[in-house]
Amino acid sequence: MNQTINLKGRSYLAEKDFSEEEILYLLDLAQKLKEKKAQGIRHRYLEGKNIALLFEKPSTRTRCAFTTACIDLGAHPEYLGKDDIQLGKKESIEDTAKVLGRMFDGIEFRGFEHEKVISLAEHSGVPVWNGLTDLWHPTQMLADFMTVKEHTGRVKGVKLTYIGDGRNNVANSLLIGGAKVGMDVRICSPQELFPDQDIVKMAEAFAEESGGKITVTSDTDKAVSGADVLYTDVWVSMGEEDKFAERIKLLKPYQVNMDLVKKTGNDNVIFLHCLPAFHDLHTTYGQNVYEQHGLKEMEVTDEVFRSKHSKVFDEAENRMHTIKAVMAATLGDLD
């Protein structure tokens, strides 16, 4: 682990703000913290700290990961849901940030507009961590790359194919994060759902520096050939439920099924998904989709989800370890 890296006092809002060395440092630190937890070694680097967890958007993994990370690090997490905070409704984000910064040592934010998390970081005076915005999902990216490294032994040069809605925050974070660390990132989606061109250009510039490669294509065969990692996400993001019929029509050819897995030509290819995944009918959501659209599986088939290729639960666990690394590195005393 690079001992010269010092992230103390930094906020973690988007991958573009961190160097390749800093991202790799966080991945190494996460691995060390995972080992400490497994061995029962205390690592209370945030002893006595108070952490605000702001959630405009509900979450299972992000909330649980930040909460358990806080407790393992010796901090006290305070959850504030959308009914507990104003954030521009009755109080400006700037004023809320200044108040929270007087009471808390660090702030996590999960919500919609990326500008809100930027404003919190600008005005609170404490480290702020992005648990998800419409634009980026940087803590997810770290968990993804930690899982990739655990199962392939590296991140540089890894061929990662994201297939599905290429405009969403996960695709954006994989593009920029992968470009930063020298991955061969392929985004495969229908042209209507290609990533924002400005983000693609940014990724291409970072890839040129790191030795990575960026491809955006609608050709599934080309995108998955030789892939080490197949990644997908939900076809309809939170707040877009009215677009179900349109998205199903667009994205059905981009479903991750066993035929697509075999087209990679890599028997050891791993499958990742940030979850929740709609791979069966064991949810109310899945039942509704089946009744309205006749689909039993959406972005990934149950066969792939439950196969040897699937590492989604390693990935989910790694949310905790990587979030812990971000918090410890930016707020703790690691000396």
UniProtKB/Swiss-Prot annotation:
Principal EC category: transferase
UniProt EC number: 2.1.3.3
Disulfide bond keyword on record: no
Binding site for L-ornithine: 169, 233, 237-238
Keywords: Arginine metabolism, Cytoplasm, Transferase
Gene Ontology terms: cellular component: cytoplasm
Catalytic activity: carbamoyl phosphate + L-ornithine = L-citrulline + phosphate + H(+)
GO molecular function: amino acid binding; ornithine carbamoyltransferase activity
Disulfide bridge partners, by residue number: none
Top-level taxon in the UniProt lineage: Bacteria
GO process annotations (BP): arginine biosynthetic process via ornithine; arginine catabolic process to ornithine; citrulline biosynthetic process; L-arginine biosynthetic process
Binding site for carbamoyl phosphate: 59-62, 86, 110, 137-140, 274-275, 319
Residues annotated as signal peptide: none
Family annotation (InterPro entries): Asp/Orn_carbamoyltranf_P-bd, Asp/Orn_carbamoylTrfase, Asp/Orn_carbamoylTrfase_sf, Asp_carbamoyltransf_Asp/Orn-bd, Orn/put_carbamltrans, OTCase_ArgI
Pathway annotation: Amino-acid degradation; L-arginine degradation via ADI pathway; carbamoyl phosphate from L-arginine: step 2/2
Subcellular location field: Cytoplasm
The family this protein is said to belong to: Belongs to the aspartate/ornithine carbamoyltransferase superfamily. OTCase family.
PANTHER family: ORNITHINE CARBAMOYLTRANSFERASE, CATABOLIC, ORNITHINE CARBAMOYLTRANSFERASE, MITOCHONDRIAL
NCBIfam families according to UniProt: orni_carb_tr, PRK00779.1
Function text: Reversibly catalyzes the transfer of the carbamoyl group from carbamoyl phosphate (CP) to the N(epsilon) atom of ornithine (ORN) to produce L-citrulline.
UniProt-recorded name of the protein: Ornithine carbamoyltransferase, catabolic
Species this protein is from: Bacillus licheniformis (strain ATCC 14580 / DSM 13 / JCM 2505 / CCUG 7422 / NBRC 12200 / NCIMB 9375 / NCTC 10341 / NRRL NRS-1264 / Gibson 46)
This protein's encoding gene: arcB
